Regions:
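Alpha-helical transmembrane segments of multi-pass membrane proteins predominantly involved
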Residues: 1-195
Length: 197
């Protein structure tokens, strides 16, 4: 297996673990600014690095082209990283960086667990990146659930607010119904087409 294909996902996962560990190690007053600055800097650097991963146009008739394409698959074709996937991953990373910048004052003044906010945001980003490269229903479902569960928790992160708790419960109920509906549709497609999930 070519683990370089999932290098972006590994990097985001490591950043999420870093945010949790640094929140435990650093004093409460310093943790927010330090963690936020490091994460924004790291994600921006990775965003720029991803420009080097783009592949030029390939001629499928050339023997070398098939080897290049095969090298972009991971775990028996369940995961594929092409230029489209790279583009959307860059957009997701950019959106996460802007979210961290705009939410900085809110995290500092309102939220009690600041490191967990960043870790959950990164786990949602990880789910989005998995969605961008998914080639089958199972991988797509895992990425979607990783993203939505992180958003459920982030919605209810303001524990002192009844509105936040109410919004989290409503979001959870609507998300559960939509997930069940999607799984039902996936099972119908699988049963009718006899393709691999």
């Amino acid at each position: 297996m070519n683990f370089a294909v999932i290098s972006t996902e590994i990097f985001i996962l490591c950043l999420g673990l870093f945010a949790i560990v640094m929140d435990l190690v650093l004093p409460a007053k310093e943790s927010h600014k330090s963690i936020g600055a490091v994460l924004i800097f790291a994600l921006t650097g990775w965003f720029l690095y991803m420009f080097t991963l783009y592949q030029g146009p390939l001629n499928p008739m050339e023997p070398e082209a098939m080897a290049v394409i095969a090298d972009k698959f991971f775990y028996q074709g369940m995961y594929f990283v092409d230029n489209y996937a790279l583009f959307f991953k860059q957009m997701f990373i950019l959106a996460t960086v802007f979210t961290m910048l705009f939410a900085s004052d809110y995290v500092q003044s309102v939220l009690r667990y600041k490191g967990e906010f960043y870790a959950l945001l990164l786990m949602a980003l990880l789910g989005m990146c998995v969605l961008a490269s998914a080639t089958d229903f199972l991988t797509m479902f895992i990425g979607l659930e990783l993203m939505t569960i992180s958003f459920y928790i982030l919605t209810g992160a303001r524990m002192s607010s009844k509105d936040s708790s109410e919004a989290a419960v409503k979001y959870l109920i609507i998300g559960s119904v939509s997930t069940a509906t999607m799984l039902y549709g996936i099972s119908l497609v699988y049963g009718l087409s006899l393709i691999h999930i």
